[in-house]
A protein has these predicted regions:
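C-terminal end-helix/capping segment
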Residues: 119, 123-137
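Short alpha-helix at the nucleotide-sugar/activated-sugar donor binding site of glycosyltransferases
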Residues: 52, 107-108
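Conserved catalytic segment of ABC-fold P-loop ATPases
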Residues: 104-107, 120-122
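Conserved acidic donor-binding loop of glycosyltransferase catalytic domains
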Residues: 60-61, 110, 116-117, 133-135
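Extended, small-residue-rich solenoid/repeat segments and analogous flexible loops
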Residues: 1-24
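Short beta-to-alpha loop/turn elements within the nucleotide-binding domains of ABC transporters
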Residues: 101, 112-113, 119, 128
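Flexible, glycine/small-residue-enriched loop-and-beta-strand segment within the central core
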Residues: 18-27, 32-101, 128, 136-137
Length: 137
């Protein structure tokens, strides 16, 4: 069991899970973070209460710029935006959440999906990139 900086209890299955810049991460109550999860908070990441995060999930609030072919990608800086994950969300195994995404309450993200755009509450989304296939409500 770990405690985030807001002192809210949640469970982190700490087998090979990493949270980079943990002071920028806020995690609600009763969350489960499975093994091999990688969270990089170059900007703020907010995870609501009762969230299930499957194994191998990547939540990354920053990515490299790459548009100028005359400059090495590593020297072009980063695109950094906050991520918000609502309450009662399930992120299936090996999903990836990209910078700037807001995932509404009650969403289900299918295994292997890459979420590049925000999702309204109670959406079920799958695929690469993730697309809404139905609503829970």
């Amino acid at each position: 069991m770990i405690y985030c900086f807001h002192y809210k209890k949640h469970y982190l299955n700490d087998i090979d899970s990493i949270i980079c810049y943990p002071y920028k991460v806020s995690i609600g109550y009763n969350c489960f973070i499975n093994r091999n999860v990688y969270i990089t908070a170059r900007s703020e990441i907010t995870i609501g209460s009762n969230v299930l995060i499957g194994p191998g999930v990547i939540i990354n609030s920053g990515m490299h710029h790459y548009k100028n072919p005359n400059i090495l990608i590593r020297d072009q800086g980063h695109h950094i935006k906050p991520i918000t994950i609502g309450n009662d969300v399930w992120l299936g195994a090996n999903t990836m959440i990209m910078p700037g995404v807001i995932i509404g309450d009650g969403c289900v993200i299918g295994a292997g999906a890459i979420v590049t755009k925000s999702l309204p509450p109670y959406s079920v989304a799958v695929g690469v990139p993730a697309k809404i296939i139905k609503k829970r409500k």
